[in-house]
């Protein structure tokens, strides 16, 4: 009789059930692991699967997380190069992809990542045909489109992390200027994640008080207080962090866990995430851009119709045209 048999009497033979709330993270670089730890610390999954092509790094990251099991409430952490470990995932988060090389054009980076996605997406779909896909790899709006095209999923199940982080950075910087918590500063950044994102100044408020109502010059070039600089800082923030520490990780990891929480718990919170915007704001192509979306267990269920100024809509359409210009050149 083994020690285990002396200690424990089995009263019910359990057939191995599937996890109910399984999450997979594809790519165990700095961003993937920041997503993983943030998800673990929010207790969002009963099983976490990690996938990557670099097997030693992958196993090391899995072991390192497993060694923290006592301090976590996720009973199963698995990893593998083979996508079989991802089977029955409810949410699959894609952070894998090539990093931009110095002097490399965005279009070139896109094509390299399309080739990586051509391998990843069919494997994800094979083992988790009903999952939601959350794309984080950059350029996120184009790669969300790519994931949608390759997966054959309905558009509500393919979500780009989009401007969720841009909006969080915006609220943080605004809050610092005003001396209050970011949760109490409301403001939205929409459109393309990154350089051509669009701050919706008309909607910025604290306690329902419109800041543009109090300070009509807000966000314009003639503004004495230079609030436009806040949006510029949002755009520059990733470049600044990359220059200082080599990459960004913690904020995007927390932002992704925030989205994962809304999806896994069916919270129906509204987030600025990348979705198919054809037919909205005068956009006529199959492009993905961030707009305020209601998120829940089935993915994106609704989109909030924003009231945008004509110049804001122009910026959105310009982004859409740029993205479509790149997308139509892609080889699938």
From Swiss-Prot:
Substrate binds at residues 106, 138, 169, 248. NAD(+) binds at residues 29-57, 99, 138. Its EC number is 1.1.1.27. GO terms for molecular function: L-lactate dehydrogenase activity. It is found in: Cytoplasm. One of its GO terms (cellular component) is cytoplasm. It catalyses: (S)-lactate + NAD(+) = pyruvate + NADH + H(+). GO terms for biological process: lactate metabolic process. Interconverts simultaneously and stereospecifically pyruvate and lactate with concomitant interconversion of NADH and NAD(+). Belongs to the LDH/MDH superfamily. LDH family. Homotetramer. This is L-lactate dehydrogenase A chain. It comes from Sceloporus woodi.
């Amino acid at each position: 009789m083994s020690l285990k048999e002396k200690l424990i009497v089995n009263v019910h033979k359990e057939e191995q059930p599937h996890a109910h709330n399984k999450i997979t993270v594809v790519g165990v670089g700095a961003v993937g692991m920041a997503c993983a730890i943030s998800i673990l610390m929010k207790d969002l999954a009963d099983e976490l699967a990690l996938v990557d092509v670099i097997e030693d790094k992958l196993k090391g990251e899995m072991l390192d997380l497993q060694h923290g099991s006592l301090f976590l409430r996720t009973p199963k952490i698995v990893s593998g190069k083979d996508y079989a470990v991802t089977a029955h995932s409810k949410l699959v988060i894609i952070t894998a992809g090539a990093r931009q090389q110095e002097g490399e054009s965005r279009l070139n980076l896109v094509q390299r990542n399309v080739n990586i996605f051509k391998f990843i997406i069919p494997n994800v779909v094979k083992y988790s045909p009903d999952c939601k896909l959350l794309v984080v790899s950059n350029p996120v709006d184009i790669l969300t489109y790519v994931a949608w095209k390759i997966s054959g999923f309905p558009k509500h199940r393919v979500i780009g992390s989009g401007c969720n982080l841009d909006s969080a950075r915006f609220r943080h910087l605004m809050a610092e200027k005003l001396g209050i918590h970011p949760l109490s500063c409301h403001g939205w950044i929409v459109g393309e994640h990154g350089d051509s994102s669009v701050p919706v100044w008309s909607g910025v408020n604290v306690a329902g008080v419109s800041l543009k109502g109090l300070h009509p010059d807000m966000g314009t070039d003639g503004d004495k207080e230079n609030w436009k600089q806040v949006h510029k800082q949002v755009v520059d923030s990733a470049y600044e962090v990359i220059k200082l520490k080599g990459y960004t990780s913690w904020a995007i990891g927390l932002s992704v866990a925030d989205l994962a929480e809304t999806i896994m718990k069916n919270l129906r919170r509204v987030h600025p995430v990348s979705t198919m915007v054809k037919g909205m704001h005068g956009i006529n192509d199959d492009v993905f851009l961030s707009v305020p979306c209601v998120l829940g267990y089935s993915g994106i269920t609704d989109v909030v119709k924003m009231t945008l100024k004509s110049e804001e809509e122009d910026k959105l359409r310009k982004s859409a045209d740029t993205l479509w210009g790149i997308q139509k050149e892609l080889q699938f």
